[in-house]
Amino acid sequence: MTIQHLIAQRLNLRDKQVEATLKLLDEGATIPFISRYRKEATGALDEVQVAAVADEYRKVQELEHRKTFVLETIEAQGKLTDELRQRITQSWDATEVEDLYLPFKPKRRTKAQVARERGLEPLAQKLLLRPQDDPELAAERFLTDEVPDVAAALQGARDIIAEQISEDERSRQSLRNVFGREAVISSKLVKGKEEEAAKYRDYFDWSEPLRRCTSHRLLAMRRGESEGMLRVSIAPADESGTADRIARPFVRPNTAAAAQIATAAADAYKRLLRPSIETEFAAQSKQQADEEAIRVFAQNLQQLLLAAPLGSRRIMGIDPGFRTGCKVVCLDEQGDLLHNTTIYPHEPKKDRAAAAATLQKLAKQYRVEAVAIGNGTAGRETEELVRSLKSQANAEVNWDEIPIFLVSEDGASVYSASAVARAEFPDHDVTVRGAVSIARRLADPLAELVKIDPKAIGVGQYQHDVDATALKRALDHTVEHCVNAVGVNLNTASAHLLTYVSGLGAALAQNIVNYRAEHGAFASRKELLKVPRLGAKAFEQCAGFLRIPQAKHPLDNTAVHPERYALVEKMASDAGTDLQTLIAHPEIRQKIDLKRYCTAEVGLPTLHDIWAELDKPGRDPRGTAQVFQFEERVHSIDDLEIGMVLPGVVTNVTNFGAFVDLGIKTKGLVHVSQLADRFVKDPAEVVQVQQQVEVRVVEVDKARGRIALSMKKG
């Protein structure tokens, strides 16, 4: 079986689709480029499918490397038979490869190894191969200074047999089947940890079938275990008879050695086999839980990154605070800092009048078009201050026309202390940088959030407990997907944002910014080829994802790739018009038969993509940010009452429900069972991050800081 066929089988694709995708990846094409511009080659695989092919190929390569290591190790021992080589070479199952390797795997000194060193291997094999012979008589021949009596000889032989049974493929697979059907995961409180482990009280005496254990419960138990609060185990629900089933292939009933072998099998099960398979299932279940948690994290991150921007506006950003005051910044349409100051409207200074006067002055001076307020400490109080300006007569500033937004502060402090922020604002402290970040998040969430480690943004589920490498790989792919799905303004994008554009990376991104600083704005995509070290391949990969508003060539501000400009120009010419007219008049495009322009390289999928771009050239798929206001009566958990219906914003979606910001410090939870008047399996079917929702308060636990909400209408 070829690698391509194997991957095609696993992903339910055609061999040709996998072959074409792997060829493009090998040639240096990126996942966004392949899914967008090479649909004819791949049979129109979408980005998820292309990424899945790349991921499966990575796993297969890892297995190939492992198989090579295993073969070399066994061969070095002089024990590699032709049959074993063939079985390992032809296997595509990592578990099977490890089972085949296990008898030859270097180990710490075991009981069986000690017994072999004492010359008891022949006795063990005699018991297995000639069970009708008297074991005690056979054992007498193996007595030495190290093996003083028959009991010691038989014990050593049983140790060897136990290890042999535990390393036998059939034994391991038999027990795996039992675990697969019957395994139960259990957790118990570690004695004396009652107070320290309070947050794990749900798991003090918990058990459930492993196959039904959700990722968040499994990760919670494993975290409690790693913190020394819980003991977690995985075992079949009913272990009676399991050791007998393991022994059956090795024991011949009614023979002299049957009891010895049965005893060895019981030892093999309890001491070696069961712990080994438990470890295996613990690792597998943890990996599956990791994958699910990472999937949810990536999904939340994508929704956050693709949140609607306000766009190019003159924005006032406010990072609120009490004692240290509120840092205020004013930005121009490009997000450049024009001014910064600090006001003290809250405790302890309570200089509200001066603060209001400063805001009025800045709004007029910098022609402010929107206000972004951080949603952290003093956020609601600062929002109330700014909204109060609407009721004050002021001929110079019409506050009714200035929308006010509460913006998530998650990760802002991480950004403000980062090297990226220091490079952008070397002469300003972290408070100014934080306020700028809040304002820029409103203007363009994607462009600002890519500067922050996704793990600091606050939409993960047990993110510190999952595989760090797998998490980084998934989140990097998510950021790359979002950046390329939206497209990037070549003349305003930061180096950090450009880094995620298909085919670029950090070095070329910085070269683009340096070129722009030296030569001014790019007039065309073609000018990219003048950027140092940006060659034809990089241009091919990145050009379609970079936009130039007001470019001389109208397609330079669309997702149409430069390699297809000539085709679109020919369509215009054949229709008796020019390119600008073709784009401006859909009725002309409607008369064009796309099938006339199909070739081996350009089929209907690509032509339909081009047509969709011409319908809305330069369109931002994210829409525009909408104003939202929390309930004015609610400022803390103490203001909540059962039955209250409140506006809220979804901040995090998990497998067990959605967390909702009510404009107070404590987030409320809408449990999955309360998301709708119907059964909901996956909360993501109903809600997503940044969604504005209406919720009803069903329970308030002030002592534990928990708020239960419902979105049910009935």
Each model region followed by its residue ranges:
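Long, highly charged, low-complexity intrinsically disordered interaction regions
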Residues: 3, 61-79, 89, 414, ...
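Short, ordered loop/turn segments at secondary-structure junctions
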Residues: 37-39, 128, 237, 320, ...
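Generic start-of-chain signal for non-secretory N-termini
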Residues: 1-19, 26
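A glycine-rich phosphate-binding loop feature that marks nucleotide/adenosyl-phosphate handling sites
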Residues: 177-184, 318-322, 376-378, 407-414, ...
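Single-stranded RNA-binding regions, centering on S1/OB-family and related RNA-binding modules
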Residues: 548-552, 556-714
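Duplex nucleic acid-engaging cores and interfaces of nucleic-acid transaction enzymes
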Residues: 49-52, 59, 63-317, 323-428, ...
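Structured, non-catalytic alpha/beta "coupling" segments that mediate domain-domain communication
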Residues: 73, 87, 98-101, 224-239, ...
